[in-house]
């Protein structure tokens, strides 16, 4: 007896039904896993809302510091629930402040132009601020308070055309300081940037990348006082920056500084924490007040750096002389 052939349409319908059945099973398994996960999360949430005897209640969402990302909050809650140290001590003890999250870190770099006699006075002409992850938070050209004498394009990358869309210094200063206040600021030779901004940042919240080689125990060639960001990037990050003859890019420099900081972030923050515990009253010198180191960068012409230091000393001597003359002329 010859078997009867099955119509092709029937085979197609069988295959279609088989595929649909497999998809349904796959979706059912996914749905089961989803429901099981949902039930587990709901159970954990209910346990955290009503702590048992001896268990520490988790902080409510309103207690979470502003600026923390939602994903970070979920991770922190999961760690808190799964941690082994869930018992509260009978006697309350002071707790250390939690380590700052990535949102508390920014990197900055500024480019200056020359104003005043022979262009020896450095004023801010561009400022860039990037986040911990390298996102550009701020990047604007800034019009100095005095007329520009020397654009220093070879180093600053600033040209006359950039000033057409520049904003006044006072406006830029307010915008930038709003980003910096309360943050840990990363940068290279930050005393230059803070000097240009006419701003003093707390020393405990400064991470100057000129200190990075010391934390990595690098050769003396990288630990000299005037080590450049370009050399650090090449030797530690294996990347080339500040190439060509069009000047620096403040965005690139700020990103590079943040990458250098992240190389030694753990060691650096441990050192900062241990120093704060050992000497809570000693916050260290503030780099923004170090006038003698202003313009101390190998990319600036040596005569320009020397003249700047000379002008600073002359201004200090002149101020001291005026104060002494005022004291002598004051009535008894």
Swiss-Prot record:
Polar residues biased stretches: 63-73
GO CC entries: nuclear membrane; nucleolus; nucleoplasm; nucleus
Motif Nucleolar localization signal, chain ranges: 21-29
Ranges annotated as biased composition (Basic residues): 20-36
Keyword Nuclease in record: yes
Nuclear localization signal, short sequence motif: residues: 160-183
EC number in record: 3.1.-.-
One Pfam match: RNase_T
Domain Exonuclease: 105-261
Membrane-traversing stretches: none
The protein's enzyme class: hydrolase
Gene Ontology BP annotations: intrinsic apoptotic signaling pathway in response to DNA damage by p53 class mediator; response to ionizing radiation; RNA processing
Keywords attached to this entry: Apoptosis, DNA damage, Exonuclease, Hydrolase, Nuclease, Nucleus
Superkingdom classification of source: Eukaryota
Database matches in InterPro entries: Exonuclease_RNaseT/DNA_pol3, REXO1/3/4-like, RNaseH-like_sf, RNaseH_sf
Molecular function via GO: DNA exonuclease activity; exonuclease activity; nucleic acid binding
Record region (Disordered): 1-102, 272-332
Biased composition (Basic and acidic residues): 310-321
Protein location: Nucleus; Nucleus, Nucleolus
Job of this protein: Exonuclease with activity against single- and double-stranded DNA and RNA. Mediates p53-induced apoptosis. When induced by p53 following DNA damage, digests double-stranded DNA to form single-stranded DNA and amplifies DNA damage signals, leading to enhancement of apoptosis.
Protein name as catalogued: Apoptosis-enhancing nuclease
Organism for this UniProt entry: Rattus norvegicus (Rat)
């Amino acid at each position: 007896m010859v078997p009867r052939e099955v119509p092709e349409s029937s085979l197609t319908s069988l295959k279609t039904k088989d595929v649909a059945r497999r998809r349904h099973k796959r979706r059912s398994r996914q749905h089961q896993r989803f429901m099981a996960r949902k039930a587990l999360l709901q159970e954990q949430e209910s346990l955290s809302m009503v702590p048992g005897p001896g268990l520490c209640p988790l902080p409510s969402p309103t207690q979470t510091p502003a600026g923390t990302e939602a994903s970070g909050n979920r991770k922190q809650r999961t760690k808190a629930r799964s941690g082994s140290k869930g018992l509260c001590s009978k006697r309350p003890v002071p707790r250390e402040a939690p380590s700052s999250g990535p949102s508390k870190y920014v990197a900055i770099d500024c480019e200056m132009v020359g104003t005043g006699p022979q262009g020896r006075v450095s004023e801010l002409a561009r400022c860039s601020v990037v986040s911990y992850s390298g996102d550009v938070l701020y990047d604007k050209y800034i019009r100095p308070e005095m007329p520009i004498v020397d654009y220093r394009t070879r180093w600053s990358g600033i040209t006359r055309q950039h000033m057409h869309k520049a904003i006044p210094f006072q406006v830029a200063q307010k915008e930038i300081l709003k980003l910096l206040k309360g943050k840990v600021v990363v940068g290279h030779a930050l005393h230059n940037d803070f000097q240009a901004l006419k701003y003093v940042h707390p020393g405990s919240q400064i991470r100057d990348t000129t200190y990075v080689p010391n934390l990595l125990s690098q050769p003396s060639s990288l630990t000299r006082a005037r080590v450049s960001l370009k050399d650090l990037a090449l030797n530690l990050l294996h990347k080339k920056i500040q190439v060509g003859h069009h000047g620096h890019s403040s965005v690139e420099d700020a990103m590079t500084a943040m990458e250098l900081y992240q190389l030694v972030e753990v060691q650096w923050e441990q050192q900062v924490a241990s120093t704060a515990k050992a000497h809570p009253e000693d916050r260290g010198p503030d780099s923004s007040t170090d006038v003698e180191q202003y313009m101390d960068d190998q990319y600036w012409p040596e005569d320009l750096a020397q003249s700047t230091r000379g002008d600073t000393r002359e201004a200090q001597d002149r101020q001291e002389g005026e104060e002494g003359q005022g004291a002598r002329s004051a009535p008894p």
